[in-house]
Design a protein with these regions (language model features):
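Alpha4 helix (beta4-alpha4-beta5 surface) of REC/receiver domains from two-component response regulators
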Residues: 65, 86-101
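Acidic, metal-coordinating helix/loop segments flanking the phosphotransfer/catalytic sites
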Residues: 33-51
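Active-site T/S-Asp motif of two-component receiver
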Residues: 54-55
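C-terminal output helix
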Residues: 89, 107-117
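Two-component/phosphorelay signaling modules centered on CheY-like receiver
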Residues: 14-32
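Receiver (REC) domain active-site loop signature in two-component systems and cognate sites
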Residues: 58
Length: 130
């Protein structure tokens, strides 16, 4: 039996987080969801994450700050950022920094699927991120 890939969702909006969790599960992924970047960083399964989907605008630590924190800590996880407030400057910067996708809410499901495929194809196996 093939092990399902673990996708992390970090989103402070409960409705969007639950909706994204249902979508990821319907696509066959195992999902861990978190209400904040701090909750995600405290997860004992951090090293098992194959992909991270994070909201850009969150209190305390934004999705962009979370991505940079992971890079600085040597824990690169293929990341897709989602936002209700898209900004071309941020989009260009994070894509140049290695983020796989920068998506506007509401998320286009087909585009998200393409970003997930790219993220999972580009990322190292979770064991390599430990």
């Amino acid at each position: 039996m093939t092990k399902k890939l673990l996708v992390a969702i970090v989103e402070d909006d409960r409705f969007f987080r639950e909706s994204m969790r249902r979508l990821m599960r319907s696509l066959g992924y195992t999902v861990e969801d978190f209400a904040s970047a701090a909750d995600f960083l405290a997860s004992p399964r951090l090293a098992d994450m194959a992909c991270l989907i994070a909201d850009v605008q969150m209190p305390a630590m934004t999705g962009i700050e979370l991505y940079r924190h992971l890079i600085d800590a040597g824990r690169a996880i293929p990341t897709i950022l989602v936002t209700g407030y898209p900004n071309d400057v941020d989009r260009v910067r994070v894509l140049n920094d290695g983020v796989v996708g920068y998506l506007r809410k509401p998320v286009d499901e087909e585009y998200l699927k393409g970003c997930l495929r790219a993220a999972l194809a580009s990322g190292a196996s979770p064991a390599e991120n430990a």
